[in-house]
Amino acid sequence: MRRSAFIMFTWCGLMFAGAASAASFPCVKAQLRSEKTICQTRSLNDADVKMATTYAIVLHALPMGGRDAEKGMQYQWLKQRNTCGSNTGCLSRSYASRQQHLDDIIQNRVLSHGPF
């Protein structure tokens, strides 16, 4: 129970800290159509911050062996996300899918078993 409360407290803290900034990447350096669309669309911007925060929590909570695999999945997801270009529906679905995957890791691998 303590671990669950700690993770949720950390997640909330990071979420509010990230909410004050724009996307999880510097929008002034956005070059891809997908990045520009994320920066210009509030709901996508919010989804990006939430996903990036959850991803950071997952990486810290996973055992070392699982981190590299998750980093690889994130890289593949970014490649897939970028194929959406400026299609907001595609980007929204991509973020929803990735967020669900990360939420499942927190529920099934971290909270139920712990990081060790």
Give residue ranges: language-model regions.
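Positively charged n-region of N-terminal signal peptides that target proteins for export
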Residues: 1-5
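Bacterial N-terminal signal peptides
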Residues: 7-16
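N-terminal alpha-helical modules
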Residues: 20-116
